Amino acid sequence: MDGVLIIDKPEGITSHDVVQAIRKKFGISKVGHLGTLDPMATGVLPVAVGKATRIAQFIPNAPKEYEGEIRFGFATNTYDRSGTPTSAERPIEGNLQEAMEALTGTLDQIPPPFSAKKIGGAPAYKLARRNRAVKMAATRVEVREFAMAGFDPPLMTFRVVCSPGTYIRSLAHDLGQRLGCGAHLTSLRRTRSGEFQIAQAVALNRVSTSDLIPVDRLLEPMPRIEVSEKDEIKVRHGNQIRTAEDAPFARIFNKQGEFLAVAAVENGWVRPRVVLTSITSHLRDRQGCILEKEIES
């Protein structure tokens, strides 16, 4: 079982809970999510299964899209509705549209103190829960779009298109700071993560093997190189072969269309970075025999 499942994460569970549920349902250990969603958030959560976990590092870090709701009037210590208020109720002071425009573009964003960001090797949220002072370093992010969808004071619905690593909770908090009234996130739904759309997402309790996106399709922007039988053996062993391709990375296939490896391309050489099948399985299929020693990538 290899590929990616696009899960519509329900509210109230962690991204790790989703991973554990898939491990239990399908009886497979190699499972990992591609981009964390907070427990309060719902929506698109890509989950790599089997061999897909090995090539996740090569999946393009593409923009993400969200829809959500912000409550103006006071801030919370978690920057969302799960937290404790940190300020008294105050009215909006300033122009909302101008404040949103100021939070669009390239930003040095400070993550929430209740986040998985590491401080001295420990997740920030663990320190924050002990009431220890948490000084978060700013992270460079890009907010391509921050648009109002509706406004019924004190609530505003919005849409955001942003780079991976952007904290929408921080965006809500910073907007409240600019308006002098405080604000926090009350709901969030991820509608797109890279090429994965909410229309593709499947409820966790309904997901099946038929929902798997094949491993090779995840890397379709990469060039495809088809190799001879002789070069196939070299690739399965992790050895380099010659090529005329000049892209940084390529997908390697054999003559039968089997996805063999992801490789770096350097100075006319294809150097396998992740080999997806062992030489043993190839020889077993070809000769009907089992080698005593399996050669893995």
What are these regions (language model features)?
Residues R140-P154:
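Helix-hairpin-helix/helix-loop-helix acidic hairpins
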Residues Y79-S82, I110-T139:
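Glycine- and acidic-residue-rich catalytic/RNA-contacting loop of pseudouridine synthases
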Residues M1-P10, T14-L37, A41-V44, M100, ...:
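Accessory RNA 3′-end/elbow-binding domains used by RNA modification enzymes
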